[in-house]
């Protein structure tokens, strides 16, 4: 089992899909990484040898922010918005959608489960 950026890649998956288990790498980024190291997308993660894993690891460390650093970067961006007091920062602070969606009926993911009229007071 290959271990990259502190994450064990799943066995028996195509390598482009397996790389998406690393936080900060999506499918497009995974394919760009594989193009850089000249590997086919359809290669299974079981078939990776040590040298190939090291080449992938070097590309990721050089060009991408992943895992803990990425999470920290995102949380610092949100903290910066809230400190500025801009519209997006206020919406983050209130736990509401930031991108213009309506909130009268939907937005349950951000607002949490429904509360009855009695619990609201």
Curated annotation (Swiss-Prot):
Located at the top of the head of the 30S subunit, it contacts several helices of the 16S rRNA. In the 70S ribosome it contacts the 23S rRNA (bridge B1a) and protein L5 of the 50S subunit (bridge B1b), connecting the 2 subunits; these bridges are implicated in subunit movement. Contacts the tRNAs in the A and P-sites. This is Small ribosomal subunit protein uS13. It comes from Desulfotalea psychrophila (strain LSv54 / DSM 12343). GO terms for biological process: translation. Residues 101-121 have a biased composition (Basic residues). The gene is rpsM. PROSITE patterns: RIBOSOMAL_S13_1, RIBOSOMAL_S13_2. It holds the Pfam family Ribosomal_S13. InterPro entries: Rbsml_uS13_C, Ribosomal_uS13, Ribosomal_uS13-like_H2TH, Ribosomal_uS13_bac-type, Ribosomal_uS13_CS. GO terms for cellular component: cytosol; small ribosomal subunit. GO terms for molecular function: rRNA binding; structural constituent of ribosome; tRNA binding. PANTHER family: 30S RIBOSOMAL PROTEIN S13/40S RIBOSOMAL PROTEIN S18 (PTHR10871), SMALL RIBOSOMAL SUBUNIT PROTEIN US13M (PTHR10871:SF1). The lineage of its organism: Bacteria, Pseudomonadati, Thermodesulfobacteriota, Desulfobulbia, Desulfobulbales. Residues 92-121 are annotated as: Disordered. Keywords: Ribonucleoprotein, Ribosomal protein, RNA-binding, rRNA-binding, tRNA-binding. Belongs to the universal ribosomal protein uS13 family. Part of the 30S ribosomal subunit. Forms a loose heterodimer with protein S19. Forms two bridges to the 50S subunit in the 70S ribosome.
